C-alpha cells in the first residue's frame, strides 16, 4: 500500500490488485487504505473479484464471474508491479503466471524468484560463484521414508548441533536446531 500510494499518480494510472490466499484477484479503491487490511474478509467482500485476461496482446482486468449484458472489462493493464510475500508469489509462480499472459512486470524473473526461494539451489549457486557457504546436505520427502538413513547421513557428515530447515519455505519458517540425535529425529 505504501509503494502504491507513493507512485506518481499524475504519470501512472495505479490499479490496486489484491491476490488472496485462495489465489483469487480483487480490485477496488479500498485496497489503497492500509487500515482496511485489518479485516481481510471484510475487505474482500467490499472489493471486486477479477481475473487477468490477455486478448490480442493486451492485458485486462475482467470482472469475475462475467455478467451478461454488462461491461466486464474493469481496466487495461500495461505492467504489473508485484509487491508480494508468501507461498506462490515469491517463488516464481506469480511471475510465471504473468509471463504466460505476456504481461510485463517489474522485479525478478521466474528463474531468479524460484532460485531465491530454494535455499539449497541458492547455496549451490553461491558456492559455485565463489561465495563462502557452510556445508549442507539435502533430503527429499522420499528420503524421509527411512529416517534412520537420513540421521546416519547427517551424523556421518556433521557434529551436533545441526540446523534443520525446509528447502523452500520463508527464510526462517520451519527452522530448528538439533543438539543431539533425539532433537534431529524431532526436527
Across the structure, where does each feature detected by a protein language model lie?
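An N-terminal domain-start capping segment
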Residues: 112, 186-187
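Acidic/histidine-enriched active-site and ligand-binding environments that engage anionic O-linkages
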Residues: 151-162
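Charged helix-capping and loop-helix junction motifs
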Residues: 148-153, 177, 181
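ATP-binding N-terminal substructure of ATP-dependent carboxylate-amine bond-forming enzymes
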Residues: 1-111, 115-121, 128, 140-152
Amino acid at each position: 500500500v505504501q509503494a502504491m500510494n507513493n507512485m506518481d499518480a499524475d504519470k501512472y494510472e495505479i490499479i490496486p490488485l489484491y491476490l488472496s490466499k485462495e489465489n483469487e484477484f480483487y480490485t477496488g479503491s479500498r485496497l489503497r487504505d492500509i487500515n482496511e487490511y485489518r479485516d481481510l474478509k471484510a475487505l474482500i467482500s467490499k472489493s471486486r473479484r477479477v481475473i487477468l485476461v490477455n486478448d490480442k496482446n493486451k492485458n485486462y482486468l475482467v470482472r469475475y464471474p462475467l455478467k451478461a449484458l454488462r461491461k466486464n472489462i474493469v481496466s487495461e493493464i500495461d505492467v504489473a508491479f508485484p509487491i508480494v510475500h508468501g507461498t506462490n508469489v515469491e517463488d516464481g509462480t506469480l511471475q510465471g503466471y504473468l509471463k504466460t499472459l505476456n504481461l510485463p512486470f517489474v522485479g525478478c524473473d521466474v528463474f531468479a524468484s524460484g532460485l531465491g526461494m530454494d535455499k539449497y539451489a541458492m547455496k549451490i549457486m553461491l558456492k559455485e560463484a565463489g561465495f563462502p557457504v557452510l556445508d549442507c546436505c539435502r533430503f527429499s520427502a522420499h528420503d524421509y521414508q527411512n529416517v534412520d538413513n537420513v540421521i546416519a547421513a547427517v551424523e556421518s557428515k556433521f557434529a551436533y548441533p545441526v540446523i534443520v530447515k525446509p528447502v523452500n519455505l520463508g527464510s526462517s519458517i520451519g527452522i530448528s536446531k538439533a543438539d543431539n540425535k533425539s532433537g534431529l529425529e524431532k526436527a
